[in-house]
Amino acid sequence: MANILLLLHPTVVTDQHLVENVKADIRKSVGDAHVEQHIIDRVTRGEVELTRNTYDKIIYINPNVHNRSIPASLMKLVYETLIDEGEFSGDLPTDQALDVLMTGFIVSDTNDQCWIKPKPIESVSIPLRRKGKKTDASVSASSGTTALPLFKKLSSNSNNNNNSSSPIGLTDSSAANTDEETDEANVMKRKLDAAKLTYFSDSDSENEEDENDDIINEDDLIKDSNQLDLRSRLIIPKSCEIPNGKKRRKACKDCTCGLKEIEEQEEAQQRSLQDSILGKMAQSATLEAIKIEERLKRQPVKFKDEDLAEIDFTVEGKTGGCGSCALGDAFRCDGCPYLGMPPFKPGEIVSIDSLGEDL
């Protein structure tokens, strides 16, 4: 009977029929199987311990499409829980291929969301056959055990034939020099040459990078020169020099040395600075006027009884705002009630007939 584990994401509660549908599909495809289910967060925190090499298949259910990443620690735990050739499938991410391979899984050729735990390959020892007489070392190799090579000292007769200054050599009595050993030596030599070539090519590329770092961009020099003072880089011709050796403060009428352009540039900068200052002052004045207007609206003007009292111009000592009503129309205001009447003396009783009609 197959053992199947369902790892549920916490957001699976949003769909109550999702897990039941997955279990129904398992019964149709596998038949009689032992199905377990756990929340993936509890497995990650270690609250639920899973037995190693137990489950034939692990299915990850995650309805959250925007977040399906799996940490490397959980991948390792799932790998240890599966049996050999077990499958880890479901809502798996497709952008973690490197983590999958580093853990030990193999991505299925037919389905990107199916990871397979490969069966370990057993190592097989292959004995090497040597030419020549069979020695004790070869016998031990055929029996499955490896023996150390035996060395013997050269005889004195062979030493006399060789140069007296040459050191005493040792010979390996366990094996003779064969063609296979020569081939192996040639292979090792080629590998060594390839390694040397790779090392020197890498060092050359590093030197080229260092040389590129020392190169100065010409555009940077131009930018630095533009930041200098324009007057310091100005070359004044001899015809523009003053006899006492001083420099001209203003450009000539027909300036050709560039001083006129510098003055125009400085004037434009000064004008723009003044415009910005005036603009800020106008803006601040407008804001202050708006604040004063709002403050006046919040505090309405109220007149007292003394301000609203009527003034009797016929009484001596009491005059209007202008104090010239008795002198005639030439000295009266636009709204004066005595307009059209002849002049009168202060204290004289004057009756106004039209005033009653208005009331």
Curated annotation (Swiss-Prot):
Task: Please tell me where [4Fe-4S] cluster binds in this chain.
Answer: 322, 325, 333, 336
Q: How the protein assembles, per its UniProt entry?
A: Monomer. Interacts with TAH18. Interacts with MIA40.
Q: Which InterPro entries match?
A: Anamorsin, CIAPIN1, Dre2_N
* Chain intervals for the UniProt region annotation (Disordered): 152-187
Query: Where is region (N-terminal SAM-like domain) located?
Result: 1-159
Give one Pfam hit by family name.
DRE2_N
A GO molecular function for this record? metal ion binding
Q: Tell me one GO biological process term.
A: iron-sulfur cluster assembly
Q: Where is the composition biased (Low complexity)?
A: 155-166
Instruction: List the keywords (alphabetical).
Output: 2Fe-2S, 4Fe-4S, Cytoplasm, Iron, Iron-sulfur, Metal-binding, Mitochondrion
The family assignment reads: Belongs to the anamorsin family.
Report whether Cytoplasm shows up as a keyword of the record: yes
The record's region (Fe-S binding site B) falls at: 322-336
Annotated segments matching region Linker: 159-228
Compartment annotation: Cytoplasm; Mitochondrion intermembrane space
Cofactor(s) recorded in Swiss-Prot or TrEMBL: [2Fe-2S] cluster; [4Fe-4S] cluster
UniProt free text on domains: The C-terminal domain binds 2 Fe-S clusters but is otherwise mostly in an intrinsically disordered conformation.
Residues reported to bind [2Fe-2S] cluster: 240, 252, 255, 257
A GO cellular component entry from the record: cytosolic [4Fe-4S] assembly targeting complex
Renumbered ranges of motif Cx2C motif 2 = 333-336
Question: What does the UniProt function comment say about this protein?
Answer: Component of the cytosolic iron-sulfur (Fe-S) protein assembly (CIA) machinery required for the maturation of extramitochondrial Fe-S proteins. Part of an electron transfer chain functioning in an early step of cytosolic Fe-S biogenesis, facilitating the de novo assembly of a [4Fe-4S] cluster on the scaffold complex CFD1-NBP35. Electrons are transferred to DRE2 from NADPH via the FAD- and FMN-containing protein TAH18.
Q: Which Gene3D superfamilies match?
A: Fe-S cluster assembly protein Dre2, N-terminal domain
Q: What stretch of residues is annotated with the motif Cx2C motif 1?
A: 322-325
User: What protein name is recorded for this chain?
Assistant: Fe-S cluster assembly protein DRE2
- Record keyword Zinc present: no
Q: Where is the composition biased (Polar residues)?
A: 167-177
